[in-house]
Structure formats: C-alpha cells, structure tokens
C-alpha cells in the first residue's frame, strides 16, 4: 500500500521538514543530555547525597512554580502567528506576539512573588538550612525566565529551529562547565547553585535575543509591548486557548518537577536526588516524541485542515516517534545500571530500581 511505502512517506515535503527540524533539535538534545549528565555527575560527586538532593529540590521547586503558573505562549504564537505569517499579515503576528509577551510578563511576576512567598513555609520540609534557604530564594528569581516561552514560539513560527538548537546546547554547556569548576575547586552547594543559576539566566536571555533579531530581520517592530487586553481583542479564541493549554501543562508538570519536590518533602532530599537521576533516564524514552511534536505543530498549522494531509502527517510522525522511543527505552534498560554506576558512583545505584 502507498501509505506504508517508505519512499512515499518521505516524498511528503512537510514530513521531511519535520524530520529536518527534529534533527536540529535532536542533535542539540543529545549534546544537552550528555552535558546535563556531566553537571549532575559533578554535583553528585561533589556533595553528599543529601546536599545533592537539596540542590535538585531547589531547582525543581523553581521549575514547578514556573510550570504551574506559566501559559504555553509558544503554542499561542505557533497557533495564531504561523497562519498570520503565511498570509503575509505582519500586524496580526505583532498582535499575537504582544499578547503572548504580556502574558509572559504578568505570569512571571505572579510566579516569582508566589514562589518566594511560599518558600519560608516549605523550607523545613524541603531540607533547607539558613544558607540554602537564601540561595533557594535567589534561584526563584529565575522563575520569570523559566515561565517565558514567547521567544521559542517566534523561532518555531519563523522556522529557525537551528537557533533553538544552539540555545538548547549552550545552556547545558554553561551548566556543565560551571559544575566542573564547582566540583574541582570544592565550592560545595553554593558553587553549584550559582553555576546553575548563571547558565539558566544566560540561556533564557539568548532566546529573547534570537527572537528579537528575527523580528527585526522581518521588519516586525514594537511586538514586545505590554498590551495584554487590547491585543487579545484581535485574536479570536485567544483566552480560551491559553487557559486550556495552561491547565493541561499544569497537570503535566505534576508528574515532572512537582513530583521531585513532593518526593523531597515526603522522603527527604537524598531520595529526591535519586528520583531526579531516575527521571533523567526515564524521560529519555519520551524525548523523540517531544522533539517530533515540537516540529510537527508549526508544519500542521500550514496545512489545510479540510484535507487528509494533516491526519496522515500526524500518523507518520507518531509511528516514527513511537519506534524511536521504544529503541531508546530498551537502551536505557540495558545500559542504565552500569551508566549510573560510572557517572554518579555506586552510592546512587538505587536510582536504577526506580527506573
């Protein structure tokens, strides 16, 4: 059948674009994963399991607050901005970006206030002493950059996945480099917090710089303007879309960063550290689907929904993601235990049982 002919599948230009963009993201993800393991390895070897767990909890706490509060503004930009660009309507694209940018700013402000305000009530349960409490409060100032996804949406809408790949490789490189320095010079907990903080700050700033540069190249000016309610008037269904994606992402976040924080509260920092290592390996199996999904969304928005092309594109992408995901999962099961022992040491081998 033609639907199962490999050559016929790859004759689809949209499918080839998805694979190309996924390859960009995949290459950076492989680099990011290796550098991320290096950063975690240095932290695990440079501190006791308990303090390693505290570091993981601090990072997960800030991310969980961000995940609960933030809107998936990158989806908004792709959903409404991509058709505007396709139809050569820069003013509508400007409205979409302005609305998305305003949501990021408002939600980021709410998140940072909420994150710092909640911290004193949770500090004892999270295993924070006086020094680590203030470092955790400092880390919470990163929440607005974690909550902002407008620049990611812009880069996807203008098909600059190469720039996304550069950013996704740069941030873990800086984190790994800082972690190596903190481990080598025995800077301890404070050194690792500062290294991770700086890498996140620089990585988040890069996204905004890349996005602003692409907007200037396309003569789209004054898009990064606080204009929440006025710009929303020109985007039909914008509010219902952002609320539905926000709720869906909040539910998703409960399984990820929030679960690490809960493990820390219930079982202690050392258990949270083991859980983080296990989740790092476990999530590798879902990475292919995530990468293809991020590439699929902009392409499907360019297709006519009245035809069968979007559906066929979804089936092809899903089958490809599932096949690669199964192979990655098998690899994790086979090499996971010796890899954990090699990278983190035998004191963290219990993490494999959690996988």
Swiss-Prot record:
Provide Cytoplasmic-side residue ranges: 59-100, 156-177, 283-323
Q: Which GO terms describe its cellular component?
A: plasma membrane
Q: Where in the cell is it found?
A: Cell inner membrane
Q: Which residues lie on this side of the membrane: Periplasmic?
A: 1-37, 122-134, 199-261, 345-355
One Pfam family it belongs to = Polysacc_synt
Where is the chain membrane-spanning?
38-58, 101-121, 135-155, 178-198, 262-282, 324-344
Enumerate the InterPro entries for this protein.
Answer: Poly_Biosynth_Transport, Polysacc_synth
The membrane topology noted for this protein in its Swiss-Prot or TrEMBL record is:
Multi-pass membrane protein
Q: Which UniProt keywords apply?
A: Cell inner membrane, Cell membrane, Membrane, Transmembrane, Transmembrane helix
Which residues belong to the signal peptide in this entry?
Answer: none
What is the protein name for this chain? Inner membrane protein YghQ
* Organism of provenance: Escherichia coli (strain K12)
Organism lineage reads as: Bacteria, Pseudomonadati, Pseudomonadota, Gammaproteobacteria, Enterobacterales
């Amino acid at each position: 059948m033609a639907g199962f002919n490999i050559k016929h599948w790859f004759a689809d230009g949209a499918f080839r674009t998805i694979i190309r963009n996924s390859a960009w993201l995949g290459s950076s993800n492989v680099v990011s994963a290796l550098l991320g393991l290096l950063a975690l390895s240095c932290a695990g070897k440079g501190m006791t399991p308990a303090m390693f767990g505290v570091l993981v909890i601090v990072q997960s706490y800030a991310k969980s607050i961000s995940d609960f509060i933030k809107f998936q503004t990158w989806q908004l930009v792709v959903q409404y901005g991509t058709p505007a660009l396709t139809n050569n309507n820069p003013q509508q694209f400007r409205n979409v970006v302005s609305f998305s940018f305003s949501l990021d700013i408002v939600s980021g402000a709410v998140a940072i206030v909420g994150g710092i305000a909640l911290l004193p009530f949770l500090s004892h349960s999270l295993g924070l002493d006086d020094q680590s409490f203030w470092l955790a409060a400092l880390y919470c100032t990163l929440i607005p950059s974690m909550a902002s996804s407008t620049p990611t949406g812009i880069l996807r809408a203008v098909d600059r996945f190469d720039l996304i790949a550069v950013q996704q490789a740069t941030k873990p490189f800086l984190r790994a480099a800082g972690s190596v320095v903190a481990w080598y010079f025995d800077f301890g907990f404070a050194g690792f917090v500062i290294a991770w903080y700086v890498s996140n700050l620089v990585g988040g700033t890069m996204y905004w710089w890349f996005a602003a540069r692409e907007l200037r190249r396309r003569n789209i000016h004054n898009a990064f303007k606080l204009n929440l309610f006025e710009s929303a008037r020109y985007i039909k269904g914008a509010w219902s879309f952002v609320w539905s994606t926000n709720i869906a992402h909040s539910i998703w976040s409960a399984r990820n960063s929030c679960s690490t924080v809960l493990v820390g509260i219930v079982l202690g920092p050392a258990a949270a550290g083991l859980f983080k290592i296990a989740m790092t390996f476990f999530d590798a199996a879902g990475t292919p689907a995530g990468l293809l999904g991020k590439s699929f969304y902009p392409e499907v928005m360019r297709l006519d929904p009245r035809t069968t092309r979007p559906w066929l594109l979804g089936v092809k992408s899903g089958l490809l993601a599932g096949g690669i995901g199964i192979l990655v999962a098998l690899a994790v099961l086979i090499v996971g235990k010796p890899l954990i022992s090699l990278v983190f040491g035998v004191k963290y081998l219990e993490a494999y049982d959690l996988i």
